[in-house]
Amino acid sequence: MIIGADEANDRDIIARSASLYASYGLRRVYYSAFSPIPSASQSLPLRRPPLMREHRLYQADWLMRYYGFAAEEIVDGASDGMLDLERDPKLAWALRNRALFPIDVNRAPRETLLRVPGLGARVVKRILTARRHVALRIDDLARLVHSLDAVRPFVVTPDWRPTGLIDSASLVGKLASRGSRQLDLFA
C-alpha cells in the first residue's frame, strides 16, 4: 500500500490490511511512503509523509500478525485515526490500557506476556521455558530482555513490584523514544 498519497488515515490502512489478511489469506502486506514526483497530478500531495509513519504501520502490522492484536485495538484512542509517531504502537496500547498492568511474569499466559512492551516473541518463549524450572526474579528478567527499563513498569516478579509506576504521569516521558529526530534533507 502506498502511504500518504490520499487522505486515508492509519485506522483505514490497518483495517484494510486486516481485511486483506482475513479475506485473501495474505501472509504479508507491504507499505511504502508516497514520494512526490515533479509534474504529477494536482490531486497528489506535494510533500511526502514522514518515514516514521511507514515504520509505525509496519510495527502495527507485526502486532496483528504475530502478537494477537486486533486492528481496532491498535488505533483505539487515536482521535484522528493516526498512530502516534513518538512511541511504538505496543507501548501506546499499553499506556492506554494501564488497568491491565502490571502482570505477573511467572503466571501470565503467553498471549498476555506478548502484550507487555519490551517483550518480544523470543523473550516470551524463553520466559515460558525458564519459569517451568524456577520463579523468575527481576535479575533473571534483566538477562532475558533487551531493555529492562521498558519492561519494569509493566511486570511483577517475587522481588519487584512497580508501586505507582504504572499510574505515574512521568511514565510517558521515561518511556519516550530516545531515538534521534528524522532530518529533512530538502528543507
Model-derived regions: residue spans:
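Conserved strand-turn element in the central/C-terminal portion of the radical SAM core barrel
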Residues: 1-11, 32-39, 43-51
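Catalytic cores of alpha/beta
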Residues: 6-22
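Long, low-complexity intrinsically disordered regulatory regions enriched in P/S/T/G and acidic residues
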Residues: 38-43, 48-98
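C-terminal extensions
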Residues: 83-112, 138-187
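Residue-level signature of tetratricopeptide-repeat
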Residues: 130-131
